[in-house]
Structures are given as C-alpha cells and as structure tokens.
Amino acid sequence: MGTSYPKLNIAAFGMEKIVPDLDALGVFTRLLARSATGQPVTTYTSHYRRPREGGEYHIIIVDNGRSALLSKPDHIKTLNCIRCGACMNTCPVYRRSGGYSYTYFIPGPIGINLGMAHAPEKYYDNLSACSLCMSCSDVCPVKVDLAEQIYKWRQDLDGLGKANTGKKIMSGGMKFLMERPALFNAALWAAP
C-alpha cells in the first residue's frame, strides 16, 4: 500500500530476484511460500509493471558481489537461492543455536556460503557451524547444493591460510587409523 500512493517509487533488489516472465513468477511465488512457511500461496506479494500516471519508477539492481560469484563455478548455484529459509529450518545446528553460531548477518547454511563468497577471510569460522549432514541440500526447493559448497569452502581454507592446524592433525590421525583396520580395532579395544 505504501508504494501505490507516492508519485516516485524506488525499488532496490539483488539480480537473482529477476524472473524471465509472469509464468516463472507464479512458480517462484508458490515455491517460496511452501518452502518458507508451508502455505499454499504467500499472503503478500507486490507486482510492479510501470509507474502510476504522472509518476516515476526507478529500479536499482544491487550487485553486492553477486557477479564475482558468477566466476566461481563451484559456488555459482548459491545465486539460485530464493531466501525461503528451508535450509535453516532443517539444519540441526541452526535449530539448536537459533542462529547464534554464525557471524554473518544471514545465518544457516545459505549464510555460510554467502559469507564465504562475500569475505572469506572474515567469515571462515562459520564453516565449522555445519555438520555436513546434507539435510539443507535435500530440502532446498531450488536445489542449491549447500552442503557440497560448504565442503568445498572447507577445502579452500588452506589456500586462504585459515586452516585449523588442530583439526588437520586430528583428521590426519583419523585417516591414519582408518586406513589400518588392525590398528583401529586395537585403539577401540584400548579406549576406556
């Protein structure tokens, strides 16, 4: 209602919000409502085609690092996200922490990926707030492979100089034990 009265309207949104036609808009509107809140259709959607008579309508398409993400083939699917929140609703870490496990302003699995795409040196610690259970990838309505992307970001930590030495040593030790079944069984037997 607040946009129907003024003679000047300014809309700002990310480039991933652009849909090719009204048929696609219908699909995304239903998909967003079902995935976010379980409703058959959303209760509030605004559609703007042109300015009102004698008015102006300006559209600002915000890039905010999105085009840089296009150059990362392993993470390009992040741009498919419709921000429904289904990944957060199913994430065991998010459900238990309420989002406080994350330092990026968007929590959950999608926030981990967006934070790493935006500033990996600042948000790399969010990668440990994921159990890689893959529930987020299974529930995503637009098939963003969130867990796979988080796994790939973890592999990139060495290149960023942010890999956790303690975790690397522990993983190396586990790899060593797992490759030697007799030694692994002996370790299990000796454990308290």
Segments predicted by a language model, with ranges:
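Ferredoxin-type iron-sulfur electron-transfer modules in oxidoreductases and energy-metabolism complexes
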Residues: 44, 52-78, 93-192
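Short Cys/His-rich zinc-binding micro-motifs
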Residues: 81
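Iron-sulfur-associated redox domains of electron-transfer enzymes in respiratory
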Residues: 1-71
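Structural signal for hydrophobic packing residues in well-ordered secondary-structure cores
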Residues: 26-36, 88-91, 95, 154-157, ...
